Amino acid sequence: MGIKYQKIGDVVIVKKELSEDEIREIVKRTKCKAILLYTTQITGEFRTPHVKILYGKETETIHKEYGCLFKLDVAKIMWSQGNIEERKRMAFISNENEVVVDMFAGIGYFTIPLAKYSKPKLVYAIEKNPTAYHYLCENIKLNKLNNVIPILADNRDVELKDVADRVIMGYVHKTHKFLDKTFEFLKDRGVIHYHETVAEKIMYERPIERLKFYAEKNGYKLIDYEVRKIKKYAPGVWHVVVDAKFERI
């Protein structure tokens, strides 16, 4: 059977309509409780999927990845399989001396593995979508974490200054527009994990130019960086992350 599908917990996502036979085959093969068709691209600021339920009713599930539990409603919340390596990398990027700010926490995609395995002093996990925030709080409990403070807010309205050794910017729509706030969060020295979607031909230039521009504007200088590819986003366009080190001038 050549049907492409993605399994999140015990819910399956497909990208095209299925026949009754195909539905039966997937249910038999995966033991899933629901099959969802993602009808259009994920849209809007809150990254909400547009879905049609092809089988079952219950779309809330618990997905296990890398020893972490993620509760989510797959009909309401996006789960990106393409970011799995980055979630693993973030798990061990920090240490117990750090304070981390996750500016776009979602349901805890990066916060949960990082808090669990790196054991930083504290993670401020900021999320403005109330549905995602609900699951973020659930996931903090599910994973028995006591070093995460969830904050329901637009990160630009959060009053935290000079607190972060590390800031995660895991969002790819005009991410640079949030950099002024990022430098407010950052201590005198720190690391920013800056995500962006960028045309392949300027992939190693544009993100760095943007980081340098906002650093200078906020009294910092870029001292070291590395650009990493996460996944192909569209033809000729990559989702990249820049690990960038800064210090205050």
Curated annotation (Swiss-Prot):
Compartments in which it is found: Cytoplasm
Top EC category: transferase
Pfam families linked to this entry: TRM5-TYW2_MTfase, TYW2_N_2
Keywords noted in UniProt: Cytoplasm, S-adenosyl-L-methionine, Transferase, tRNA processing
Record family assignment: Belongs to the class I-like SAM-binding methyltransferase superfamily. TRM5/TYW2 family.
Catalysed reaction, written as an equation: 4-demethylwyosine(37) in tRNA(Phe) + S-adenosyl-L-methionine = 4-demethyl-7-[(3S)-3-amino-3-carboxypropyl]wyosine(37) in tRNA(Phe) + S-methyl-5'-thioadenosine + H(+)
Any one biological process term the GO annotation gives: tRNA modification
Function: S-adenosyl-L-methionine-dependent transferase that acts as a component of the wyosine derivatives biosynthesis pathway. Catalyzes the transfer of the alpha-amino-alpha-carboxypropyl (acp) group from S-adenosyl-L-methionine to 4-demethylwyosine (imG-14), forming 7-aminocarboxypropyl-demethylwyosine (wybutosine-86) at position 37 of tRNA(Phe).
Alphabetized InterPro entries for the sequence: MeTrfase_TRM5/TYW2, SAM-dependent_MTases_sf, TRM5-TYW2-like_MTfase, TRM5/TYW2-like_N, TYW2_archaea
Full protein name: tRNA(Phe) (4-demethylwyosine(37)-C(7)) aminocarboxypropyltransferase
HAMAP family, sorted: TYW2_archaea
